[in-house]
Regions:
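Bacterial signal peptide processing site
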Residues: 19-21
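C-terminal motif of bacterial Sec signal peptides marking the signal peptidase cleavage site
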Residues: 15-17
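Sec-dependent N-terminal signal peptides
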Residues: 5-13
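The alpha/beta-hydrolase serine catalytic core
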Residues: 44-52, 57, 63, 127, ...
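N-terminal secretory signal peptides that target proteins for export/translocation
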Residues: 1-2
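Serine-hydrolase catalytic machinery in alpha/beta-hydrolase-like enzymes
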Residues: 54-64, 76-145
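Primarily recognizes the serine-hydrolase "nucleophile elbow" in alpha/beta-hydrolase
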Residues: 137-187
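N-terminal cap/lid segment of alpha/beta-hydrolase-fold proteins
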Residues: 24-75
Length: 187
């Protein structure tokens, strides 16, 4: 019995020590407030760190997103902001990005977890769908600083799908301290 417990203990310790640490690419960087260049890159931007729709005395947080432009050069672009589910950014999301970029859309994929030091949140106790929505509206505000970006849609799934649904409601939009609004949203 002790041998089995010892083996189980070794396996658990090995798994924990091999787990990938969450790294925040925005540490020691400043928030971008304007997007001038039409190039693919990682962007650090400021969001409201709120679990709910009460924004009084809430801290801001520097989070990141990856910006992807289509190879086709245009005078103007439409864009999509992508928000992941409770499992965080996944490799298969790249296929979604490629599909949307191939359609001629600019894609901005938000990482809601790195700055918050979260690997995944299956309990929804650390962040909420509203937290994700706040990040998406902050990303929208940033994207709209680029005069080449016209319409911006909002795409989310699983926990990340809460924001696109809520963004359709006037009562929710009235509470959000950002003026810009999404042209469309899909959950």
């Amino acid at each position: 019995m002790q041998y089995r417990l010892f083996i189980l203990f070794v396996i658990v310790i090995t798994m924990v020590s091999c787990a990938k640490k969450v790294e925040d690419p925005c540490i020691n960087k400043s928030a971008k407030t304007v997007i001038k260049q039409n190039i693919n890159n990682l962007i650090c931007f400021e969001s409201i760190d709120s679990y709910d729709l009460n924004y009084k005395n809430k801290d801001t947080i520097l989070i990141n997103g990856e910006l992807f432009y289509p190879n086709i050069k245009r005078d103007y672009y439409d864009a999509v902001i992508m928000t992941h589910g409770s499992g965080g950014k996944r490799r298969y999301h790249k296929k979604y990005i490629e599909l949307l970029v191939d359609m001629g859309l600019v894609v901005f994929q938000i990482d809601h977890y790195a700055a918050r030091k979260i690997k995944y949140d299956k309990t929804f106790s650390k962040v909420s769908g509203i937290t994700f929505m706040n990040d998406a509206y902050a990303a929208l505000k940033l994207l709209k600083t680029n005069p080449k970006i016209r319409n911006v849609g909002y795409l989310g799934w699983s926990q990340g799908g809460v924001g696109p649904i809520l963004s359709h409601f006037k009562s929710v939009n009235d509470l959000i301290p950002i003026r810009e609004r999404f042209k469309s949203a899909v959950a």
